[in-house]
Structure formats: C-alpha cells, structure tokens
Amino acid sequence: MDNVFDYEDIQLIPAKCIVESRSECDTSVTLGGHTFKLPVVPANMQTIIDETLAKKLAENGYFYIMHRFQPEARVNFIQDMHGSGLIASISVGVKEEEYAFIEELAATNLVPEFITIDIAHGHSNAVIRMIQHIKKHLPNSFVIAGNVGTPEAVRELENAGADATKVGIGPGKVCITKIKTGFGTGGWQLAALRWCAKAATKPIIADGGIRTHGDIAKSVRFGASMVMIGSLFAGHEESPGQTIEVEGKKVKEYFGSASEFQKGERKNVEGKKMFVEHKGSIKDTLIEMQQDLQSSISYAGGTKLDAIRNVDYVIVKNSIFNGDKVY
C-alpha cells in the first residue's frame, strides 16, 4: 500500500453547477430500506448518544445508532422506540450474553430495524459468528458489522451476512489504538475507505477521522453510504457528556469507547478523554452540515448526493489549509 492519503490531503474538483440555489440539492440517503435526511450518524459512544437524543434524531428523520454500554436497557429502548412509531437501532458486542440477548429478542418478537455489531477489531471469527447468529434469529434486522480496515475483512463480513460494514480502525480523535498498538487506519483513513469500498458490494459506513464538514463529502466521494462522526457531535446541549466550566468556559467531556473512563478500569485501554467546547444545540450543527453538503453537491455539478461520487480529485499533501487552523 503505497501512496496513501487522508482527508486533508485531498481536494475535490468542481464540475459545472446546474442548480439556481444550493437549497435545491438533496442530501438524503437510503439505508436498509429507510430514508434519512443526511448520510451522517453520530458515533455510538456514551458521550455522544443516549436514549433522549436517539429519539430526537429519529423523530427528525436522522439515522442514529444507540451505544451498547447499558445492555440491560436495550429491550425497553426497542419497545419505547417502536411504541413511538420510530425505528430501533441498537449495538451489540460479541460476548456470550449477547447471543442470549438476540435469542430473547427473537422469542419476544422484538425486531430492531438496525443492529450494529460494534467491536474495535471487527475482522474476527467472533464477529462472523455473531452476524450468522443474528441473521438466523432476526433475519429482518439490517446488520452493520465492524470495525474493519481491509478489503478482505469487508468481503468476509459481507459473505457472513452483514448488510453493511463499518470502516475505520483508530482514526478517531479520542482513539489511541494507533499509538498503543501500532495498528490502524489513522493518518490514511480516507485511502482505507476507498480501498474497502472498491471491494464492497453492500453499503460502507466510514467511521472516524472526520474533522470538517467537507470530510463528509470526501467520504461520500470515496465510497461511503453513511459517515459516522464523534468529535463534531460531542459537546452539544443534548450530548450526554457532563458539562463543566474550565477557566470560565463551558466544556463537555468526550471519551473513547475503549478508554478507562468507559470501562471503569485500566485494562486494554485504547481510548482517551478530552474536553470539547460547548457547542449549543445539535439541531444547528445538523442544519449547518446539511447546508454545507448541499453546497458540496452543487460544486459536484448535480442535485443529489450521488453526484459527489463522480467528481475528480487531486492529492495535495498537507497543504489544503494553507496554515489555517480549522480544528
């Protein structure tokens, strides 16, 4: 793998604009038979999403994935979402008790629309077994499996029955896998996405390394159907993290799923904690993301998201910000 690149090394090249206004551009995307306003999903992390925010996102036409760090609350969550006429989208791990949980859902006919198998190194026999188990007991649930970073992994998980794969090993802002283990897609996440997307026959979710709204468009260009974002969604009014004051500024905590803050112990730690500036309402961020993506579509010369997939690009090593600090 020579010649890899990441988000900041790429510029997309404009094509002739065919709209009068960017508001004519449609940012919606369909996944698992459901249509969502944006190809974006907040990360299924404890400081990014909780039940209240999940409900709010679903009510407003956005995709969400509930985290798996309160496993005992999942049955009630599915019932609650379905009771409100909303989709249920949950996460599971691969431990023994998760097998029983899936069987329990099947036995009580509680069928979540989306189930994400969420582990750090998704190219594993454990994940393949879990995909097969879910598909056997809940064949109508859309299964997202991850995380992976290679075409072989994408092929194997798709062949096992995954309906989508999640790509990204350690590129996230609060992920330190790359430092602790020497492995991952940190620093070349966009190239890894492209490499995986070429092998994929089903949707890919790009996960990690997004630092600007332009990175969403770049992810779509290189094959993502959906883009998972953590740090840009952290620190909002609705974010579950604690709000505290540091030097007179309001900040919120944001930590990785494999951090000691998540686990409650220092064992196999591959995540860290940081404080992010309080950003106001998540609604404003979602609207801004949509407007920026509408602009991206207009620069791509189309009216729909797919237009972005066909544009040319250049690799400009570490120069696109011209010294500007954007994050």
UniProtKB/Swiss-Prot annotation:
<dbReference type="Pfam" id="PF00478">
    <property type="entry name" value="IMPDH"/>
</dbReference>
<protein>
    <recommendedName>
        <fullName>GMP reductase</fullName>
        <ecNumber>1.7.1.7</ecNumber>
    </recommendedName>
</protein>
<dbReference type="InterPro" id="IPR015875">
    <property type="entry name" value="IMP_DH/GMP_Rdtase_CS"/>
</dbReference>
<comment type="function">
    <text>Catalyzes the irreversible NADPH-dependent deamination of GMP to IMP. It functions in the conversion of nucleobase, nucleoside and nucleotide derivatives of G to A nucleotides, and in maintaining the intracellular balance of A and G nucleotides.</text>
</comment>
<dbReference type="GO" id="GO:0006163">
    <property type="term" value="P:purine nucleotide metabolic process"/>
</dbReference>
<dbReference type="GO" id="GO:1902560">
    <property type="term" value="C:GMP reductase complex"/>
</dbReference>
<keyword id="KW-0521">NADP</keyword>
<dbReference type="InterPro" id="IPR001093">
    <property type="entry name" value="IMP_DH_GMPRt"/>
</dbReference>
<dbReference type="GO" id="GO:0003920">
    <property type="term" value="F:GMP reductase activity"/>
</dbReference>
<dbReference type="InterPro" id="IPR013785">
    <property type="entry name" value="Aldolase_TIM"/>
</dbReference>
<comment type="similarity">
    <text>Belongs to the IMPDH/GMPR family. GuaC type 2 subfamily.</text>
</comment>
<dbReference type="GO" id="GO:0005829">
    <property type="term" value="C:cytosol"/>
</dbReference>
<keyword id="KW-0560">Oxidoreductase</keyword>
<feature type="binding site">
    <location>
        <begin position="204"/>
        <end position="227"/>
    </location>
    <ligand>
        <name>NADP(+)</name>
    </ligand>
</feature>
<feature type="active site" description="Thioimidate intermediate">
    <location>
        <position position="175"/>
    </location>
</feature>
<dbReference type="InterPro" id="IPR050139">
    <property type="entry name" value="GMP_reductase"/>
</dbReference>
<dbReference type="InterPro" id="IPR005994">
    <property type="entry name" value="GuaC_type_2"/>
</dbReference>
